[in-house]
C-alpha cells in the first residue's frame, strides 16, 4: 500500500491463522519476500548481498532460510517433494492470475510457511506407518491405492476438487536445517492464482476433512511462520515509475537457489530464503 496505493490485488490479505487442538498455523507479519533460486549458492549470496546493500536502510530482515536440494528432490522426512506439480501450460494456469483480476494479470499469490520436524519421533515410525501418513511409497514415490490410503493422508487432504476437477498449485518447497542444532525442516512455498486453494488445503490439514480427521504429519511437524504475498508480473514491475522509496518502509528479504523450472524433477535448490519486514508499524 505504501509503494503502490490502490487498487490492490483482489485476494491479497493477511495470512489467516488456524488453530485446532494442539495444531496451529501461525500468521507472521511481513511485507516483502525475495525467493531466489540458482544452481550456485555463491550467486544467491551475491544477489541478496546487493539487494540488502540497496534497501538495507529501509528494511528489517525477520527471517532468512537457506535451502538446498536433498538427494532426488526429497524432503528431510525422506519422501520426494513436489511429485504432483503441474508442468508447462498447466503450471501457468495453476499459478497465474488472469482475467479475474485484469490489473494484476500475470501475477501470482504465494504462501510461505516454515515447518520444523521432530525427526526423533518421526524416525521411530516404521516405513509403512510413514507411508500411510504421507499417502505414497517412500522409496518408489508411488501413490498408495485408494484402498490402502487413509483419508487423513497428507496427499488426500491437500487434494482440492472443484466442479469435479482437481485444482493444482505450484510448489517449490525447500528442505533446510542445522544438524548441529537439531534443526530439520521444510520451507513450504506454494504459488497459486488464488490463495483460497492453499487456504483450503491448510484448513483440511489443521482442522480436518471432516473436522477431526486432520493431517497426521502435523503430529511431527510444526509451523513457525505463515505469510501470504502477491507476486507482481515482470510487466507490472517494468511499468512502475522509479523514484525514492518511502523511508518508513520495512522489507522482507529471502534467498533460495533456483533453476528456471520449479518442477520437481528438474529444479535445483541450494540457496537461501530470507524474509524481512517494513520498519513502520501499522501498515499493510
Question: What do the predicted segments below correspond to?
Answer:
Residues 1-276, 281-283:
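Long, histidine/aromatic-enriched segments associated with O2/redox biology
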Amino acid at each position: 500500500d505504501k509503494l503502490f496505493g490502490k487498487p490492490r490485488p483482489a485476494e491479497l490479505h493477511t495470512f489467516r491463522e488456524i488453530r485446532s487442538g494442539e495444531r496451529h498455523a501461525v500468521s507472521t507479519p511481513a511485507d516483502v519476500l525475495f525467493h531466489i533460486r540458482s544452481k550456485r549458492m555463491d550467486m544467491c549470496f551475491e544477489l541478496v548481498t546487493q539487494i540488502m546493500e540497496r534497501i538495507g536502510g529501509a528494511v528489517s530482515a525477520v527471517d532468512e532460510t537457506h535451502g538446498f536440494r536433498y538427494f532426488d528432490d526429497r524432503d528431510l522426512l525422506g519422501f520426494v517433494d513436489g511429485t504432483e506439480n503441474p508442468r508447462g501450460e498447466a503450471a501457468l494456469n495453476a499459478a497465474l492470475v488472469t482475467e479475474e483480476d485484469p490489473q494484476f494479470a500475470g501475477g501470482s499469490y504465494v504462501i510461505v510457511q516454515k515447518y520444523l520436524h521432530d525427526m526423533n519421533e518421526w524416525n521411530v515410525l516404521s516405513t509403512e506407518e510413514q507411508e500411510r501418513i504421507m499417502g505414497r511409497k517412500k522409496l518408489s514415490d508411488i501413490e498408495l491405492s485408494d484402498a490402502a490410503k487413509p483419508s487423513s493422508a497428507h496427499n488426500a487432504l491437500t487434494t482440492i476438487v472443484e466442479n469435479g476437477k482437481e485444482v493444482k498449485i505450484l510448489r517449490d518447497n525447500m528442505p533446510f536445517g542445522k544438524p548441529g542444532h537439531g534443526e530439520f525442516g521444510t520451507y513450504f512455498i506454494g504459488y497459486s492464482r488464488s490463495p483460497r486453494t492453499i487456504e483450503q488445503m491448510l484448513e483440511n490439514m489443521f482442522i480436518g476433512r471432516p473436522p477431526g480427521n486432520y493431517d497426521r504429519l502435523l503430529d511431527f511437524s510444526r509451523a513457525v511462520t505463515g505469510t501470504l504475498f502477491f507476486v507482481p508480473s515482470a510487466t507490472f514491475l517494468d511499468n512502475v515509475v522509479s523514484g525514492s522509496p518511502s523511508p518508513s518502509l520495512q522489507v522482507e528479504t529471502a534467498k533460495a537457489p533456483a533453476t528456471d523450472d520449479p518442477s520437481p524433477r528438474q529444479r535445483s535448490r541450494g540457496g537461501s530464503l530470507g524474509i524481512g519486514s517494513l520498519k513502520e508499524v501499522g501498515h499493510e
